[in-house]
């Protein structure tokens, strides 16, 4: 009798595990073509902060309708947890702020789009998680409360992303922290799918070092901006040589790279630009890089998405930018990986990473070259 009971128990556990795994695989199909919504509930650096005016007006119903009309099936909503967390009371989320977030989520869902609630704090917030266990405890309490709040929402349409680009250099500590945060989310929302990632910048190398969580109702994700020499040309943050780059071509061409390298102020940075051409960055190279992520997912039998990829618009040639976006998107789709481009670009005046030409005032309009590169229609 004991053997029979044990056998039944093992079969039940096995069936439950397969069911949870199939949930994640099935739900990943809702996340095929997405766009990031940034600078709304995160990345707000205006001294006024997260004001009511900003939260109710940065992205409008017209924007969400435009996203739907372009052919996207979901959005990734960046959320900075800091404005919602009070010291030692992280599980008590302010109702007014939560009300604005509820309004945003409802607006997205009302347009038939799924939404990823992407926890997207600043680097200082993440540094505390790296160094202090008490900060991890508070963040766990916050996640548990937020997940519980949204636990009544359709789990086919609402997803919880643990932490954007964790910036943990110690992948073993990140493994423990991620498992704890995932458990807190699961406590709050037993039926919803969680999105996890590798340590540090969540790139492919970080993904390859990741061992999947024991929770099977999880989708894994990575970010792809390789090579940054091309995708971040003209950027005023990050590596100092990016700022001096302009019109670096894609696919890589040595003659073009030599011209761009000549504008660098020192020899080391000139060599960094030349390496871009020497590494032969083209569609084949992109396929090889992303193929590693696809093989990792196949090995572990887990669903996988790419939740960020894109090219900074200000100093890149529009056609070269479109070619890179096309090649990344086509490779992801070939490998069965859902994607999320960075980003929508509301009111960035066409100078950021956006899929729209976002004026400071007035309606956003699709950037047709980018829309076509994404295989979408408008």
Regions found by a protein language model. Give the residues of each.
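Aromatic-rich peripheral "rim/lid" segments of glycoside hydrolase catalytic domains that contact
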Residues: 315-378
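Active-site mouth of glycoside hydrolases
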Residues: 22, 27-193, 198-206, 217, ...
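Structural motif corresponding to alpha-helix initiation and N-cap regions
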Residues: 57-61, 287-290, 322-325
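Short conserved micro-motifs at the rims of enzyme active sites and ligand-binding pockets
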Residues: 46-47, 230-234, 343, 351-352
């Amino acid at each position: 009798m004991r053997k029979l009971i044990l056998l039944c128990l093992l079969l039940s556990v096995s069936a439950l595990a397969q069911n949870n795994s199939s949930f994640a695989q099935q739900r990943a199909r809702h996340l095929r073509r997405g766009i990031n919504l940034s600078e709304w509930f995160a990345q707000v650096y205006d001294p006024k902060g997260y004001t009511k005016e900003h939260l109710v007006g940065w992205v409008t119903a017209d924007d969400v309708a435009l996203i739907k009309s372009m052919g996207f099936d979901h959005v990734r909503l960046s959320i900075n947890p800091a404005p919602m967390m009070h010291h030692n009371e992280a599980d008590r989320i302010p109702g007014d702020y939560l009300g604005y977030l509820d309004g945003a989520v409802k607006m997205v869902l009302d347009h038939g789009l799924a939404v990823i609630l992407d926890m997207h704090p600043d680097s200082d917030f993440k540094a505390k998680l790296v160094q202090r266990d008490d900060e991890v405890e508070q963040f766990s309490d916050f996640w548990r409360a937020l997940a519980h709040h949204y636990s009544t929402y359709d789990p086919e349409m609402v997803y919880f992303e643990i932490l954007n680009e964790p910036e943990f250099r110690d992948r073993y500590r990140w493994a423990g922290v991620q498992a704890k945060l995932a458990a807190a989310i699961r406590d709050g929302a037993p039926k919803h799918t969680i999105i996890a990632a590798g340590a540090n910048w969540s790139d492919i190398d970080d993904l390859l070092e990741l061992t999947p969580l024991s929770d099977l109702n999880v989708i894994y994700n990575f970010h792809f901006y390789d090579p940054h020499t091309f995708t971040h040309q003209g950027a005023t943050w990050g590596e100092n040589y990016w700022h001096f780059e302009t019109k670096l071509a894609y696919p890589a061409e040595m003659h073009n790279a030599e011209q761009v390298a000549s504008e660098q102020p020192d020899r080391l940075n000139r060599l960094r630009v030349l390496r871009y051409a020497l590494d032969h960055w083209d569609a084949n190279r992109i396929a090889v890089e992303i193929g590693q992520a696809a093989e990792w997912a196949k090995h572990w039998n887990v669903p996988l998405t790419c939740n960020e990829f894109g090219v900074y618009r200000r100093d890149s040639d529009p056609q070269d930018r479109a070619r890179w976006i096309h090649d990344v998107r086509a490779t992801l789709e070939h490998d069965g990986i859902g994607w999320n481009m960075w980003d929508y670009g509301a009111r960035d005046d066409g100078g950021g990473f956006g899929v729209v030409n976002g004026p400071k005032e007035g309606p956003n309009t699709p950037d047709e070259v980018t829309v076509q590169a994404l295989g979408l229609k408008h």
